[in-house]
């Protein structure tokens, strides 16, 4: 049985405080089961963990926020090449709706990438989500790259940690305006900012 959802595409500056609070609750509930550390950035009314998205795709149902995907245009450095991407992040589906196919509805975001003139969508996920992303790939062109180190700055400068961290996450690339063969080769990606 599929949940009936209504999708809303909105720019970050269109969100009201009450919506940030509702999204923060959603992220604590969605990311909390993966570990309390993952829910910590969403304390209070903060509805982002690292970099703040510029555009959000939010699904609502009768119980509130059902799913979310954030987007941020940025240049990442792959080897010596600066590559414009639409970074995807802050992805989540409410736990009671997992497995119902709602996550695949995020393909509604793909035409938006064309409007934003980004040649690739880019994101990173932990290896435990590889099967989920592979299923997502059945509905459109998705390339999963492993063995790539991704450098990101921390969301806030801290005295007790270095200013950057390096992850060995899976890299997700969706070709939008170009062929995947145009994606630069390299084993290190520098976000030049915090993860979305």
Swiss-Prot record:
Main location: cytoplasm
InterPro entries with a match to the protein in the record: Acyl_CoA_acyltransferase, NodA, Nodulation_prot_NodA_CS
Species of provenance: Rhizobium tropici
Matches recorded under PROSITE patterns: NODA (PS01349)
Top EC group: transferase
Localization terms from the record: Cytoplasm
Entry keyword set: Acyltransferase, Cytoplasm, Nodulation, Plasmid, Transferase
Enzyme Commission code: 2.3.1.-
Family matches, as NCBIfam families: nodulat_NodA, PRK00756.1
HAMAP family, per database record: NodA
Protein encoded by which gene: nodA
Full protein name: Nodulation protein A
Cited Pfam families: NodA (PF02474)
């Amino acid at each position: 049985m599929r949940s009936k959802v209504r999708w809303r595409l909105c720019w970050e500056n269109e969100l009201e405080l009450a919506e940030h609070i509702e999204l923060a609750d959603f992220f604590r509930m969605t990311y909390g089961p993966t570990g309390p550390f993952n829910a910590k950035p969403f304390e209070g009314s903060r509805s982002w963990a690292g970099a703040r998205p510029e555009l959000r795709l939010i699904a609502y149902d009768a119980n509130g926020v059902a799913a979310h995907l954030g987007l941020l245009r940025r240049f990442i450095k792959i080897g010596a090449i600066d590559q414009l991407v639409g970074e995807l992040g802050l992805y989540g589906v409410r736990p009671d709706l997992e497995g119902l196919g709602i996550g695949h509805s995020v393909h509604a975001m793909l035409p938006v990438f064309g409007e934003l003139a980004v040649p690739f969508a880019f994101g990173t996920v932990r290896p435990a989500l590889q099967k989920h992303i592979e299923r997502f790939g059945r509905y459109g062109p998705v390339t999963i790259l492993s063995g790539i180190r991704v450098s990101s700055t921390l969301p806030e400068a801290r005295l007790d940690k270095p200013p950057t961290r390096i992850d060995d996450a899976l890299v997700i690339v969706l070709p939008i305006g170009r062929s995947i063969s145009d994606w630069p080769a390299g084993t290190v990606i520098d976000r030049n900012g915090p993860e979305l």
